Amino acid sequence: MRIYRIDREEEAIAEVQRYLRAASYRYEEIPHVGIDGIYGEETKDAVTAFQKHFRLVETGVVDETTFSKLYLESLA
């Protein structure tokens, strides 16, 4: 199981950021994020907003549930 949290840097983080960016165009309460592969405050804030919008536990951490929802939203 992948878990993404602040201060992680890798290609998989860029994937999460791409999903978040796509969601931010559909839902105005989710802020736009840069796609740099770094899980910083900007990404954490967007993850938290995404979790809040979809009534997930608001941790700012991309756990399995959050990742699954991000992925499904990217297919919409």
What are these regions (language model features)?
Residues 1-37, 42:
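Acidic, Ser/Thr/Pro/Gly-enriched interdomain connector segments
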Residues 19-23, 53, 73:
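Active-site catalytic microenvironments for nucleophilic, acid-base chemistry
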Residues 35, 50, 54:
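Calcium-binding motifs, dominated by EF-hand helix-loop-helix domains
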Residues 41-44, 64:
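Short, electropositive, low-hydrophobicity segments enriched in small/polar residues
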Residues 47:
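Conserved hydrophobic/aromatic packing and binding residues within compact polymer-binding modules
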Residues 55-76:
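Extracellular LysM carbohydrate-binding repeats and other cell-envelope/extracellular binding modules
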